Amino acid sequence: MSLLITSPATVAAAATHLAGIGSALSTANAAAAAPTTALSVAGADEVSVLIAALFEAYAQEYQALSAQALAFHDQFVQALNMGAVCYAAAETANATPLQALQTVQQNVLTVVNAPTQALLGRPIIGNGANGLPNTGQDGGPGGLLFGNGGNGGSGGVDQAGGNGGAAGLIGNGGSGGVGGPGIAGSAGGAGGAGGLLFGNGGPGGAGGIGTTGDGGPGGAGGNAIGLFGSGGTGGMGGVGGMGGVGNGGNAGNGGTAGLFGHGGAGGAGGIGSADGGLGGGGGNGRFMGNGGVGGAGGYGASGDGGNAGNGGLGGVFGDGGAGGTGGLGDVNGGLAGIGGNAGFVRNGGAGGNGQLGSGAVSSAGGMGGNGGLVFGNGGPGGLGGPGTSAGNGGMGGNAVGLFGQGGAGGAGGSGFGAGIPGGRGGDGGSGGLIGDGGTGGGAGAGDAAASAGGNGGNARLIGNGGDGGPGMFGGPGGAGGSGGTIFGFAGTPGPS
């Protein structure tokens, strides 16, 4: 019965509807009573008299049953009406104590918060005030014990967005406000810091729109400064040159993690009538947590795509963040982000993917991040961007510690057009003191044009070299990596 919901208004409406049905039936029964209970005899013979008497008896029995049914109907309608009244009374009785309790709670909080509100401008318990729209006003700080920071207000024309308010002991930072529009867009506000014990950093505000100039930069994500919490996401860059030739705004970086938590993701670069904006870098982990993902580069409608942000560094026990994807460009593709390095124990982040440069050169894939200083694998390299000048695959990250495998090289991008080769495969990363080298990336596909595979990574002391990546359309396969100096076998060359 916990899922049963009763609406007194609905019950009362149903009772009224049923009462109308009963009234209509009573009218119909009354109209039918006279012609059915007193039938005229068709003839003077006994058969006609008996038939008329039989039908009259049926009619009288029907009227008797109808009277009983209508009596039951009236009782049912009365019960529904009474139920609606009782439910409404119960709701009223329950609402009054709850409203009184809420009033008492608010009064208590007002009394408790009054001293610190007067002295420090912030409550003990409660959320900070939000900044007003179109003012660029900063969000208020959250309660000293509990409460989120207020959100920053959006900026007016040529005005930066407000910063998000900081939390107190427990709570999340407020969001940064969106930057205001202008000939050049204004900056988005930074996200507020998370609580000293628990809480995430607030996201940064997006950059403002540039009507003929550059888009505004996105605000940085707030840091998680306490024990538990993740960094805030960086704000995306503003759109640039909607009526002109401006560049996209650069995105904000992700916030740093708490001791236990992940770095914030970098924001995406803004779209530009000329070049795309830069993607924001991923925030770093601190103790136990991963680095944030790098933001993608922005689209350059008549120029180059924006370069992507790099992945954040992993914490002591954390993976590096993946690099962002380069921005699409009308001329050149934006550079891919590099994967973040791990801390002491974990794996490097993957390199970001390259991007198409529709008028000239597509970008190569990003290099994978290095593995942990004690043990951990290198991150894989990113894919090369496709195009008429396809990008090469990214190199795999190295395993720099005691144990670990080198990261695999990324595949080359596909070549577009007659006789256009694909990109070369990326080389594999080297292994740890004990560990194998990474596999070389395969060559990108092309129009019957030869392209080469990447080389396998080398082992160091104990381990096998990585295999070379395959070539394409007669292009050479990558060389196998060398085996360990103490023990190990060389990698197999890739097929052509």
UniProtKB/Swiss-Prot annotation:
Q: What induces it?
A: Expressed in lung granulomas of guinea pigs in late stage of infection (90 days of infection).
Q: Which domain of life is it from?
A: Bacteria
Keyword match S-adenosyl-L-methionine = no
Keyword flag Oxidoreductase: no
Instruction: State the GO CC annotations.
Output: extracellular region; host cell mitochondrion
Q: Which residues form the PE domain?
A: 4-94
Q: Which UniProt keywords apply?
A: Cell wall, Host mitochondrion, Secreted, Virulence
Chain segments annotated as transmembrane = none
Places the protein is found: Secreted; Secreted, Cell wall; Host mitochondrion
Instruction: Please name the Pfam families in this protein's record.
Output: PE, PGRS
Q: Where is this region: Disordered?
A: 461-480
Its job: When expressed in host mitochondria, induces mitochondrial stress which results in mitochondrial membrane depolarization, up-regulation of mitochondrial superoxides and release of cytochrome-C in the cytoplasm. The cytochrome-C in cytoplasm triggers the activation of caspase-9, caspase-3 and caspase-7, leading to the apoptosis of host macrophages. Being a late expressing protein, apoptosis induction by PE_PGRS1 may facilitate the M.tuberculosis survival and silent expansion of its niche at the site of granuloma.
- Can you quote the domain comment? Contains 7 GGXGXD/NXUX calcium-binding domains.
* Similarity comment text for this entry: Belongs to the mycobacterial PE family. PGRS subfamily.
Query: Protein name, please?
Result: PE-PGRS family protein PE_PGRS1
Q: Which gene encodes it?
A: PE_PGRS1
